[in-house]
Amino acid sequence: MPSDDGPAVMVALSNPRTEGALVALAGALAEHRGGRLLAVHIVTVPDQTSLETAAANRERLDRSSADLLAAAVDDAAAFDAPVETKTVLSHRGIEEVFDAARTNDADAVVMGYGGARFAGGRAEGSLDELARDLPCDFLVLDGQRLDAGEVLVPTAGGPSSDLSAEVALALRDVSGAEVSLLHVVDEGEAASGREFLTDWADGHGLGDVDLRVETADVGATIERIGEGYDLVVVGATERGLLSRVVRGSLASAAIQRLDTSVLLAERPSLRSLRERLIGGR
């Protein structure tokens, strides 16, 4: 059952190698929002294995899950946010993440790129529809560690860039990150671009960070400049980013070539939120 301890930031865990980075990100966001952290270990069971058979091996699964969730609790202790843990056995992979987010009334979900692709042993027919109707904010980290020393946030505005800004603010205020904003414009639009970025930064509580306005191709510019940062936070420019992630397409080719860690941010559209409230289409 959902708790009443403020907004819930759910972190979906499936790999011990990425647990620390995901909890560090989710913990910073939970503290920033004055909410709680929900660590969920989703154990994806192959289709050929029944859930009953998997449950019969529960002792082994419980040990593995207990170790992973204990590590999550330890890492979460660094943040001023209460933490809860859960383990779920499922054939449905990514669908289970959406169900858990809805069941627990999550305000945001943090997961790894590899975890976002755990589709179980079958093709998930409703995947596109599922990923285009997000139940809450989604953050997908491509990288096994989170170094929040220097963070770059490219922006052209929009709801998902608003989420990127909130994450950057959380990492700055909670984890001590140094944040830079990047806005890429066409030739001859540098002045208007700087005016836009200055106003955008002020409106998102980031008026004191480094502002960069570049005139070039957007993807190539993010690739070139992003290499100098520890983390690049990229907001979705259209609905369905998560659908592409699950199918193995991280983002643009330029983003995929980045050696640094990338955090993909997608915020539900107003239409999706309205549909959640009225329960229809």
What are these regions (language model features)?
Residues 2-54, 150-204, 209:
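Small/aliphatic-rich secondary-structure junction motif
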Residues 1-20, 108, 113-169, 174, ...:
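Intrinsically disordered or low-complexity boundary/linker segments at protein termini
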Residues 31-104, 114-115:
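Intracellular, membrane-proximal regulatory regions of polytopic membrane proteins
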Residues 68-75, 126-127, 192-203:
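Short, aromatic/basic amphipathic alpha-helical patches
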Residues 117-118, 186-191, 240-242:
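Short, small-residue-enriched loops and turns at beta-alpha junctions
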Residues 77-109, 119-122, 204-242, 246-249, ...:
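Structural beta-alpha unit
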Residues 24-26, 96-99, 126, 167, ...:
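A short acidic, amphipathic alpha-helical/loop segment
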